[in-house]
């Protein structure tokens, strides 16, 4: 079959979505160096900022985990977990695995928007070797885990809670990024900017990596 015949709508479709993000990550996050690595954090945090702007979120907690993972927890309404009519799966799965899923949600209920590049949390998922999303909503905790953007099981209940909000824990894929070393000061600068721009929103940043502390357990400043 000729190359011309191979270039069809089907072949283009095959490169859309999560697969295309992994093949061309720089198109979505700028680059696969330090800037792109830190941009992943901004994308997740920006969803919490949207909730704050809508008057539903007052706290965002960002943690750098051992192994250069990132945890972002907010006290917003929580990503919807009900079945999405068009997709036939939980809305949480749609948000986490469909590029541009924000347009699939009613503007009055929930939207997902991105940061600088407007790509959203699904791109973070695609570029992570592991990601876990937990939603605290209406007294229950709903979870789903992913590997390189692919869901490992359907959204399920995992317990009860007296909190509300969304927690995302992700570990960037070492096959994608040149370095996995998050710089505390880069993230701190961005979080300070967001806090200044969003009055009434409390943003915290914690570095749990042992390499970031001195012998007495105090935070070391970046060089």
Describe the predicted segments one by one:
Residues 48-49, 53, 65-67, 72-75:
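Long, structured ligand/cofactor-binding scaffold of large enzymes
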Residues 58-64:
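A conserved short beta-strand within the histidine kinase catalytic ATPase domain
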Residues 20-23, 27, 50, 54, ...:
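Conserved helix-loop functional segments at active or binding sites
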